Amino acid sequence: MNRFLLVSLLAVLSISPARGGEADISGSVELQARAFWNDPQWVGQDDQALQGTVVSTTEIRWYNDDGNQRAAFIPYLRWDATDEERNLADLKEAYWAFEGDDYEVLVGANTVFWGVTESVHLVDIINQTDFAGDIDGEDKLGQPMVSLMLQRDWGEITGFVMPYFRERTFTGVDGRFRPPLPVDTDNAVYESSDKEKHVDLVLRYSHYIGDIDIGLNVFSGTSREPRFIPSADGQSLLPVYD
């Protein structure tokens, strides 16, 4: 993943404002706190009543003068005072995209969102959940990809090639939001012998008829939703990605 994201970053930086266009830069630093009124329930959990976290996000977006190219670079940093497994350095977005008359090509890392009205969060097909960030499952990790979108009168077809798999983040032994046994993310089990280097594919068709949106998806690859098995010593849970 690091090599792919490095290429993505170099591509983004090479499309600089010096070549024309417009760049928007913004950022934020958040101080977060979680308060716990009850004592820890499981062995190993930190017993402090207050858990502090610092989150930093920078957002850089560039658009060329012709309006057919854009780039984004959005690094995300999180540091937790109690649980080191919540520490995270991620690229939510780091891509370059070119838009033609009826197609679009995107290369890099991206966070894909297909709407909140669907019965299942289909974004989970593309992006992995940052469960250590928040237990509601809404926080996502950036996904390295190459995508091609074709626009036709009968609908929109988008294909995704994802050359690297992102493992789900989990709270560590010290964390309060965890199951009785902590999840051992260092010893994840994969069904595929390629492990995190397995190439995943997604094909999506979308269209609308009046006020009705239609979306059909075909996925081939490693599931973002792990199942769990106990470790050999019975002291932790191992995530299994099928």
Where are these regions (language model features)?
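Outer membrane beta-barrel
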Residues: 61-177, 210
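Surface-exposed strand-loop-strand hairpins of Gram-negative outer-membrane beta-barrel proteins
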Residues: 33-54, 236-238
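Transmembrane beta-barrel architecture of outer-membrane proteins
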Residues: 28-30, 51-57, 72-74, 88-93, ...
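Sec-dependent signal peptide recognition
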Residues: 2-8
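Hydrophobic h-region of N-terminal signal peptides that target proteins for export
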Residues: 10-18
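Transmembrane beta-strand segments of Gram-negative outer membrane beta-barrel proteins
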Residues: 21-40, 69-73
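Extracytoplasmic loops and strand-loop junctions of Gram-negative outer membrane beta-barrel proteins
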Residues: 40-43, 76-78, 127-132, 183-189, ...
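Signature for the C-terminal beta-barrel architecture of outer-membrane proteins
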Residues: 22-25, 101-102, 139-242
